[in-house]
Amino acid sequence: MIQHNCAFCVAVACIIDFCNPCSIQHYYHFVAELLFGFWRTYSSLDPSISDSGISALSTPRRIWFVHLDASQWRDPPRLNEWVLRSAFPSLTAEYSNDWIDRAELGRPFLLDRVLFSDRAASMQGKHEHKVGRPLAEACSLPGSLRWWSPIARNALQFAGLVDESSMVATGPPVITYISRQKRGGRMLVPEHHERLVEELYSLRDKYGYEVNVASMEKLSREEQIRLAARTTVSVDTYCKRYSLCILRCRL
């Protein structure tokens, strides 16, 4: 007997994303909204995540980009794929053509555990209306105080920071000014940039602070993550660059 109505089980945790390319091809939107919101939601299932990032949750193994092809979720600095692969080394991705393939098979797939991600839908939530941020809905859920630790620790270890002793915990503050002067776009007028650098270095000389004037486009992705993890105070002319700092373990 041939059965045509049976479902085929996909027995792994799966993310199904409905975002369009314009809302995902930037590190801020992909990591600081989609990934951050996904894990904040998923981690609410385990209120006992430890400081060391140990969780009873199964690691997501699939992400399906329903409306994107393989190139449309990547950002120019290529941080999106770096963070996703470092956070979930075993994750596999499927794209719009794969979604069509599955639909055309004419068979249902039973997902063991699935989380739907839709930025446009989250903007209709009551919490988002209060603060104007799609993440507000996910952040309203209960959860462990260390809910982000599993993601941050995976990414930091991937960047070569083995544990928190590699980060600044004691000692002088680390001030990082992310300069955009050579990149163009949102940047300070030259004289204001020079004055800011001068004043930051005066803090270094007077108080012993570590001061970094960094052009991120000159650093590798690992170097960017390591610098962000060590930074105590970040200074930038463009707020979305601060989203690198979310990979610090303690938020």
What kind of region is each of these model predictions?
Residues 1-251:
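The feature primarily captures lumenal catalytic ectodomains
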